[in-house]
């Protein structure tokens, strides 16, 4: 798989229209939504310094946690679908800070096995988080506080990810 990029390929404007996503099947909604979470999450955990991207990423994670289950369960929920479009756009903005292991593995595995990129990110997410715990724990604990999980620990956030995956039907 090759990534092709050039600044002239960037759009001049982006239109977020939730009505265009209403027919998306639940499994695809879940997988693409988890891809949005992975963009925000990996941007937050990137070791590079970009405080604005971090703030955007944290809010993008919150939006995914709140609205992805709704968008997946009720495909005609325009509010949930709109907020997921916003979370996705936030992730695309935030990942200028960088991505990480989830995407490095998902790109390669997707090319080898013709597997959906978002689904691979969702499957890999808890394992990559756990493997990188020592490097990202402080940021993840801050995110757990922002998400108001009731427990600001890395383990609580990891459980949040596992619970979200289970609710969405993501394989373990």
Map each language-model feature to its residues:
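Short beta-alpha connecting loops at secondary-structure transitions
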Residues: 22, 107-108, 145
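Glycine-rich phosphate/pyrophosphate-binding beta-alpha loops
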Residues: 89-121
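Hydrophobic aliphatic residue packing
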Residues: 14-15, 102, 128, 170
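Gly/Pro-rich interdomain helix-loop hinge
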Residues: 112-172
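A general structural signal for well-ordered alpha-helical segments in protein cores
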Residues: 34, 61, 102, 121-122, ...
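Carboxylate- and glycine-rich phosphate/diphosphate-binding segment that chelates Mg2+/Mn2+
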Residues: 2-97
């Amino acid at each position: 798989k090759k990534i092709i990029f050039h600044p002239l390929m960037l759009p001049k404007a982006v239109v977020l229209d939730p009505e265009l996503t209403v027919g998306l099947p639940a499994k695809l909604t879940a997988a693409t939504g988890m891809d949005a979470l992975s963009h925000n999450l990996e941007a937050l955990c990137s070791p590079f310094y970009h405080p604005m991207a971090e703030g955007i990423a944290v809010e993008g994670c919150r939006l995914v946690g709140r609205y992805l289950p709704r968008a997946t369960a009720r495909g005609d929920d325009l509010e949930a679908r709109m907020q997921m479009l916003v979370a996705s756009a936030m992730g695309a903005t935030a990942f200028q800070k960088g991505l990480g292991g989830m995407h490095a593995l998902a790109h390669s595995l997707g090319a080898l096995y013709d597997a959906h990129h978002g689904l691979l990110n969702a499957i890999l997410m808890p394992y990559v988080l756990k493997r990188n715990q020592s490097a990202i724990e402080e940021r993840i604990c801050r995110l757990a506080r922002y998400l108001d999980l009731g427990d600001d620990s890395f383990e609580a956030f990891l459980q949040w990810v596992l619970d979200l995956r289970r609710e969405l039907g993501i394989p373990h």
